[in-house]
């Protein structure tokens, strides 16, 4: 298991990031995001990453709507940014792998943007326990997950740091974004929203288009 510092989740006005120690080439000491922030404008570009495993996520479907999902990594300062296109999501390459059987698969995205409007991650606020999501992976498979828990924590609240960072324990799809009322800088949104979903069965082959 990789050694990882804790994550602190903070909503801020100008950008979205998961921050932590800088990425290293050693997977046992890879960087771990320290925070998540959600923004309204002036979004810097993400750090593109390469998903070496074909089982990496390529899209996520929620309520019949699909968001392309890009691998993203931390930069030298430890910042992890979702795609600037708010219709897309970012899968943190240092989190768990779909179908791996353990750990948290961390997916994040922008709630909105002043120019683009609502982002795909805004849909996370409408998710309810029992809802189903589909993660399609690069090996041509679709993995189904069922939402089993929702959590919204104020910026001053206690965050589920162990659950966000873990690579062991039950496999969990963890969607992370900001929520609640937009309160302006420096906090941005009032809350941090989490959607926890568990696998419902084995992967299925994705039909050819």
Predicted features by range, described:
Residues 1-13:
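N-terminal export and membrane-targeting signals
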Residues 17-20:
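C-terminal motif of bacterial Sec signal peptides marking the signal peptidase cleavage site
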Residues 22-128, 137, 149-209:
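Solvent-exposed, non-transmembrane regions of membrane-associated and secreted proteins
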Residues 138-142:
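Short, charged beta-turn/beta-strand-edge "cap" motif at the junction between a beta-strand
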